Amino acid sequence: MRGAYGACVVGASCALFTGRGYINQMISAMPWDFWFIFLFLSIVLPWRGRERMRHFMAQPQVLRRERIRLYASTILFQWMLAAIVAWRAFARGLTLPQLGLAGGRPSSIFLLTFIGATLIAVAHWMNLRRMAGSNHPAAQKLRAMAERLFPQSLTETIFFTLLALTAGICEEFIFRGFVIAALFGAGLSSWAAVIISSLMFGVAHLYQGKGGSVGTGILGVLFASIRIAYHSIFPVVVWHAVLDVVAGLAGARYFGKQATPEADRRGGLLL
């Protein structure tokens, strides 16, 4: 089973997405542990994210120590999840190139990564600055989120940056590395793998609301297409991390408000 599953990737681009018969093919071709991971990513992960977001948004104020605890626990959770996914992927015979961890032309990949990261950083920062002066419901929701969850001190910014880097590495490995490799191994074509992995990525971000989930899914289409075209997750890892870093820094700057020292003293911690 180990070697056979890894070899399935060779003919993946020839697969057809043909309704019930194709779904039956997926069910029979994908190992049980991969299905378990897929169900976890599609059901448990979105539920966990929405519940945590609902909890924090219901609070009139979130203390600095609570934000740092949130950042740290999320970092730990993502690395643990990525480690489990990697364990099962390698146990089933998936290779580094199949997972997007090796291959492609380094010069092209580095150039694409640099140009993309620069454009993403500038565009995302400018968009958040533009939204700051708006009373649109999306801007109001972002403002409420920034006041509670975005970094408001140097210590928080360090932890948030580590969280952004973790999300870039772990989420891209899981959704663009493992998920796409698993779908290829089950016989999906490239376009089907792009769509399904992007739907899963969007659903995993339901805690951002319907609009945020849809936008994340659309972004996932771009990221998945780049991963397949260049046989590497490196560009999208960097782009994802840049998006999150800019969201935290620009969001805190244009939407957040500084937590009061008195509130943190009452919480027992002043950073």
Describe these PLM feature segments:
Residues G21-I23, Q61-I68, F90-A167, G185-A186, ...:
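Juxtamembrane helix-loop-helix connectors linking adjacent transmembrane helices
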Residues W79, A83, T118, L199, ...:
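Hydrophobic alpha-helical transmembrane segments of multipass integral membrane proteins
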Residues F38-P46, M145-L271:
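Transmembrane helix-loop-helix hairpins at the membrane interface
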Residues R2-S108, A192, G248-L271:
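N-terminal, membrane-interfacial amphipathic/helix-forming hydrophobic leader that caps
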Residues R50-H55, L128-R129, G177, A181:
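Short helix-terminus and kink motifs of transmembrane alpha helices
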Residues A58-P60, R69-S73, S134-Q140, F173-I174, ...:
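N-terminal start-of-chain detector that recognizes signal peptides
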